[in-house]
Amino acid sequence: MNKGLLIEGSTFVLGDDVNTDINCSNKYLPGKDVAYVAQHAFEQLSPGIASRIAHHGGGILVAGEHFGINSSREQATHVLRQMKVRAIVAQSFGRQFFRNAINNGLPVFECDTSAIGEGQSLELDLARGVLCCQGRVLQKSHPLPSEILAILSMGGLIPFLQKYPDWNFA
């Protein structure tokens, strides 16, 4: 399996309408490094989530509808990477956040998340479009387009373009 296309981890569940201001608050951004901002991510929604994810050595965020709505703040994905978030599974994403996540090598997967609970074992196979929870298949969907899978397998758009400078996305 290619790097970044098969992801496993414990789940950390958030709700609906998780906007980028909640995971990357303006209150902490000015002049602060990403590690500092990551310590305060989601604190008004799920206090201590950053330390819980760190305690597990990383994890998978699970959300409902509209994850990453509001701003196109690219730092939001940097904060999630700093927190060792391996992927985000949500019912829907803000489109700008979705693209920022892909461009920064952070896997995102849209599916019904209603059956996924906190602390469960999740396995996500992006190449096949399969999501397993606690060892059973929860979701089969269309895999992400090959161009997106290629970007994710390289760790983001910049590493991808450095390796393939003449790539045509047409």
Feature-to-residue mapping (PLM):
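Feature captures the catalytic cores and cofactor-binding loops of soluble hydro-lyases/lyases
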Residues: 24-128
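Conserved phosphate/anionic-ligand binding catalytic regions in large, soluble enzymes, centered on
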Residues: 18, 68-74, 152-162
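Acidic, glycine-rich flexible loop/linker segments
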Residues: 102-170
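N-terminal, positively charged, Ser/Thr/Ala/Gly-biased leader segments
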Residues: 1-26, 159-170
